[in-house]
Amino acid sequence: MLSTSQSRSFKNKFRAAFWPVHNYELGKFIPISALMFCILFNQNILRILKDSILISEISAEIAGFAKVYCVTPVAALFVIIYAKMINHLTFEKIFYYLSAFFISCFILFAFVIYPNIHIFHVHPDTLSDWMNKYPHFKWYISLVGNWGYIVYYSLAELWPNIFYVLLFWQFTNELTTTEEAKRFYTLFSLFGNSSLILVGFLMMNLSSEDTIIKKFVSISDSKITLVQVSTTIVAIVAIICCLLVRFISKYIFTNPLFYAKIKKSRSTTQRMGLIKSFKYIAKSKYLWLLLICSAAFGFAINLVEAVWKAKIKELYPTVNTYAEFNSLYILWTGVAIIVMTIIGNNVMRMHNWFVAAVISPVIIMVTGILFFVLIVFDQQILSLFDGAILMSPLALAVSIGGIQNILAKGTKYSIWDTSREMLYIPLDDELKTKGKAAVDVISAKIGKSSSGLVQSIIFTLVPNATFTSISPILMVVFTFVCFAWIYAVRKIYFEYQKIT
């Protein structure tokens, strides 16, 4: 009897640690995991393409301007439109309409605009003359003259915040109780983020000189072929996402076993108007702290990424070589996320919310400072380790920046994302939907655009400045933002305890 009891105890502990999903819950767990996998699959293909196109075709410096003057206004407009849509359309229809809009735009760019970019854009010589004539406004001139790249970049930048952070997690939070979230969310992250590894291998092949595409079609321009094939894959996976949303809406939302408790609470909720809704959100200290946390990540990581991506372009100057390196980085990011998800799953169950949530800002701050120190004091460090470092200063900077970003994204997309989503579960429907839309879409873009604003002001005032030359300033700002993030995490933990 004792042996049987001990065996059951061990089995229960093993299951709780590695597979805390009951068999009857698989009908909910598997479709949601598949949806997350597909959304992140597309997200990372678009991430590789948008950076490879914008930075290789124009420059790394232009990205900050695009985030401030293009991405942020579009994100703000989307939140207003979304708040209107949610009062008149079902979630399912909203997902379909937004998917159709984004995929149509990506297809238009890949098959019409990009192959004929010389028709749609200002001639490079004319653009160069204007930029030389007005050096303080050269980046703004470049924004307008290269509008096709900017629009594509802006839409690809919005994809993660709209389809993953907002729509997917809103959908999932609606279906999941707090008790289920503690067991499911890290596993969602584990399965969903495994898509990064697949995307990494796929895009490395598509962007390489020996791509498998050559076996099926003749390639006249490798970068255009890369974008067109990748966009076709994105469109197919987007259709699969729509089918999964349809399946979940039809078979899970209507199943009392999966949705009865939440459905009952929803029936008593009244919708507020747009103006009243935003006034309600503005009064929430809880959401303001959430906004600071999300904005801080976007701000901090964008400062490091901007310098790192400028170094990548120096080492890999073409669209395809940049994309190939980016694919390798995405692959290892996927590996890091899976490892940290397993660690985070146990941290979240064994410790309180604060311990799990503070891991991300601490790791990002420490690794980010190390990267900036290498950039700012590169010559001193190389002379100190003369002969011991078997690579060029440029290759070393790209490698260290890659490690920093892999660790930062690994902790963010595994531990921090799941910790943040738990904060929405105790909230009422209005804050879960419109509040989440405002925080998740706007805050991330405020963070990135604020970072971009700092960069754009410097590059406007000092036209000849480069990311390397302004790195000391960026390092100081980066450190301050990370400390603010840690402070906000501590404050919101106290608020979270009050309502759970």
UniProtKB/Swiss-Prot annotation:
The chain crosses the membrane at residues 26-46, 62-82, 94-114, 149-169, 184-204, 224-244, 287-307, 328-348, 357-377, 381-401, 469-489. One of its GO terms (molecular function) is ATP:ADP antiporter activity. It is a multi-pass membrane protein. It holds the Pfam family TLC. Its main location: membrane. Keywords: ATP-binding, Cell membrane, Membrane, Nucleotide-binding, Transmembrane, Transmembrane helix, Transport. GO terms for cellular component: plasma membrane. InterPro entries: ADP_ATP_car_bac_type (IPR004667). It is found in: Cell membrane. The keyword Transmembrane helix applies. Belongs to the ADP/ATP translocase tlc family. Provides the rickettsial cell with host ATP in exchange for rickettsial ADP. This is an obligate exchange system. This energy acquiring activity is an important component of rickettsial parasitism. This is ADP,ATP carrier protein 5. It comes from Rickettsia typhi (strain ATCC VR-144 / Wilmington). The lineage of its organism: Bacteria, Pseudomonadati, Pseudomonadota, Alphaproteobacteria, Rickettsiales.
